[in-house]
Amino acid sequence: VCYFTAHEHLNREYICVKVDREERPDVDAVYMSVCQAMNGQGGWPLTIIMTPACRPFFSGTYLPPKARYGRVGLEELLTAVAGQWKTNRGKLLDSAGRIEAYLKEQERATVSAEPGMDLVHQAFRQFAGNFDKKNGGFGGAPKFPTPHNLMFLMEYGTREKKREALTMAEITLVQMYRGGIFDHIGGGFSRYSTDERWLVPHFEKMLYDNALLALAYVGAFGLTGRELYGGVARKILAYVGAELTDAQGGFYCGQDADSDGVEGKYYVFTPKEICRVLGENAGTAFCDRYGITEHGNFEGKSIPNLLGNEAYEEDVNAGYTKAEQAKKELTIADLQKLYEYRLQRTRLHKDDKILVSWNGWMICACAKAGAVLGETEYVDLAVRAEAFIRKNLARNGRLMVRYRDGDAAGEGKLDDYACYILALLELYRVTFQEEYLARASAWAETMIEQFFDRERGGFYLTAKDGE
């Protein structure tokens, strides 16, 4: 009802334009810069309100139908802005003018010198000042995994011999794994946690998140040798192989959070349900281990997690007794039974677009995991996905953006070229097949020719002969 009212208001007072950020990352980038300039940060879904001349004066991220938890509601916002437009239009136009002037100034800004290590040290200090020592991650709720930040900290800690940086990354990686943001039954990570403990996720799973998280966990395994990290990476890639891989080799974008119209329904359990699948004894033990309780932790049911279990296996390299090893194998068997049971539920909708940029990240993750973990099947996944892109998303020496149901569309953007080149370089490092290096070099030349600004430096998001 709330959204119906909002729809009525939108159609009466506004002209609505919906942008698919996956197909038009260039348009998304323009308006994300507006949001970041106005609010200091951005996010999705992104809401922009503009004048008829397309000059933005409001920006925000997620808006609930009605105000709650101190957050303005969509319905109230639409009413207020429409009223201001009628009675105080000059104020809104002034706001639009200020943000436009700021963005033009930023566009003209030039860098006087190459960035140095001072900037890198500053980034580390910023992370250290914002680190959640108890739960891992940075800041409060909602919490995003930000694997790129964790990879930076691991690299910085290694190069600068800064143990604090490595500790921040490791605490975060462990706590995310223990939380409900990680799917302990089916593998893979959800987009973000609604709470600071990583317990209750927004249940949508995205390919790019899981690609970068796989890279982070593989990197942590390479640094420490702790099997926990290697095991999480394996579960991520097992999930991608089972749920997000096209029969021809490409990787799908992700899975929705809802089934039967209810967010998270696919992922939660009751103790009775667990015991019915596993039997009373095994079911009770599983519930104790994974926090499945009668009162639940999410709308009366439970998201499996290890946050309350201090005895979880953290490092198999420490060695197991025969009894402990048998218990571990039993847990794996229980997880498989629950996975097969869960498959009988109403399946989650898949976004079956295949994007060059996101596939590039996942190819990198699979190839690197194959090399570091010694699993050739992951390299095979990467090889097949690269072949899919080469066959279906490269035309006349240029890349496309996406493929779906036999149709490739969209002029490739900068991130498509950059991510695909990274994928080719990673495949070369892993396989030593020179064809990958040759293709990476050729695509890099095309990227420089089409996107590089030879006067001021830097790369444009769209090609010089693009729209």
Protein language model regions, located:
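Long, polar/charge-rich, low-hydrophobicity segments
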Residues: 242-245, 396-397, 401, 405-418, ...
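Primarily a tetratricopeptide repeat
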Residues: 167, 171, 231, 235, ...
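Glycine-rich, acidic and aromatic/proline-enriched surface loops and short helix-turn segments
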Residues: 175-182, 384-395
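Phosphate/diphosphate-binding loops
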Residues: 267-294, 421-450
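Replace the tail clause
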Residues: 1-365, 369-372
